[in-house]
Amino acid sequence: MSAAKIKKGDKVVVLAGKDKGKRGEVLKAIPKEGRVVVQGVNVVKRHTRPTNTAAGGIVEKEASIHVSNVAHEDPKDGSPTRVGFKVLEDGRKVRYAKRSGDVIDG
C-alpha cells in the first residue's frame, strides 16, 4: 500500500460536491476506504436515541467524503495542490506541495 498523501490535521480544499470550495482540517483519515472526514464539510443530521448517559435528539456531525474530492492547501498561497514525496539530505521522507515546492510536514 502506498504512503498516505492526506493525513489527520492536514489543511484541505474540497474540489467537488455540494461543499465545493470549502476549506477545513482533516479530522479523521480512513485509508482502507479511501475517505476522509473534514471539519465543517458534508454535515449530516443524525437522530440519536436517548441513553443513560446522553440525551437524545438531532445531532449534526461531519460525514466522510472520498479522498479524490479533496486536495491539499498549498502552504504558500492556500490554493489547491497535488502532493509529492521527496527524501531530504538528512534522509527523512517528507511530503511537499508540487505547486510551490514547499515541504508540508516538518
Swiss-Prot record:
Source domain of life: Bacteria
Annotated Pfam families: KOW, ribosomal_L24
GO molecular function: rRNA binding; structural constituent of ribosome
Family matches, as InterPro entries: KOW (IPR005824), Rib_uL2_dom2 (IPR014722), Ribosomal_uL24 (IPR003256), Ribosomal_uL24_CS (IPR005825), Ribosomal_uL24_KOW (IPR041988), Translation_prot_SH3-like_sf (IPR008991)
CDD domains, alphabetized: KOW_RPL26
CC terms in the record's Gene Ontology section: ribonucleoprotein complex; ribosome
Keywords (A to Z) from UniProt: Ribonucleoprotein, Ribosomal protein, RNA-binding, rRNA-binding
GO biological process: translation
Similarity field: Belongs to the universal ribosomal protein uL24 family.
PANTHER family recorded: MITOCHONDRIAL RIBOSOMAL PROTEIN L24
Entry-linked NCBIfam families: rplX_bact
Subunit-structure text: Part of the 50S ribosomal subunit.
General function of this protein: One of two assembly initiator proteins, it binds directly to the 5'-end of the 23S rRNA, where it nucleates assembly of the 50S subunit. One of the proteins that surrounds the polypeptide exit tunnel on the outside of the subunit.
Stated name of the protein: Large ribosomal subunit protein uL24
Organism: Rhodospirillum rubrum (strain ATCC 11170 / ATH 1.1.1 / DSM 467 / LMG 4362 / NCIMB 8255 / S1)
